[in-house]
Amino acid sequence: MKYLFTATILVLLTPAGIIAQTMDTGVHKILFLGNSITYAGNYITDMEAAYTLWHPERRVSFINMGLPSETVSGLSEEGHAGGRFPRPDLHERLHRILKAVQPDIVFACYGMNDGIYLPFDQQRFQRYKDGMNWLHDTLVKTGARVIIVTPPVYDELRAGATGYGAVLDKYADWLRLQKKSAHWEVADIHYPMKKYLDAHRTLDAAYGVDGFALAADGVHPGEAGHWIMAKQLLLYLGEKKAAGYQGIKNIMEQHSNGAGILQLVAERQNFMKDAWLTATGHTRPEMKTGLPLQEANTRALEIGRKITALLQQ
């Protein structure tokens, strides 16, 4: 019964308000900016795998430049990471990223870390708004299509920072308002994730259990959470067929080599994100050193040929 409930909710999460904007055929590079949730990259892998299966004739690079702990507000809580280092600030590295990648589309998802896990404060909120305005303006000047993504949901039951869920609601609401007031492109993942979480909590309460978590630690989504993110962004890009699928595995099952294609896409994503981060530089310690970018690109091309071969079988 719970599986049926989950499947039903995943289908119902397709918001009627999403306006499909099919991706232009001239798009070759999609850049993803964000924090540790983006760095984990499952939603990017899901998007790339689905897009590859649906558009085998296209060659689009999904470039993950997420950096754990990062903010656009420039704020960092006292004792962050056990006092080992402050949160990195996107201001320090964005110009290098844009010069190196020269993207056609940019998805930017910030907010989870920007309130630094404290109750709502107008000054912190202003720092977030200032950071997002700077980010949007900087990206627009490059000529890229800019899609701002609302922050994922925060689960207070699992994470423990009481009131922080409401903080992210405010941050997401402000971003959504920019669609009308500033004519931004804004893709909402916050409220679809919140709707899914609330529905499961209602079911848990009805059965007297406390078993569901969209993110085990309340912050970093698991497989279902990343799929909700991927699904909303695919729909935003005009991929209407994403609405009917409960997860990436259901999509890949439509091809006899789907599982192998997904595995190769994930493998390529995992080494390319570290190669890009190392090549463009950042201030966050304790990160894996990536392959030299030229070596990583050569390896990525080899994987691309394998994917093409599997698609044609």
How does the language model describe each region?
Residues 6-16:
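Bacterial N-terminal signal peptides
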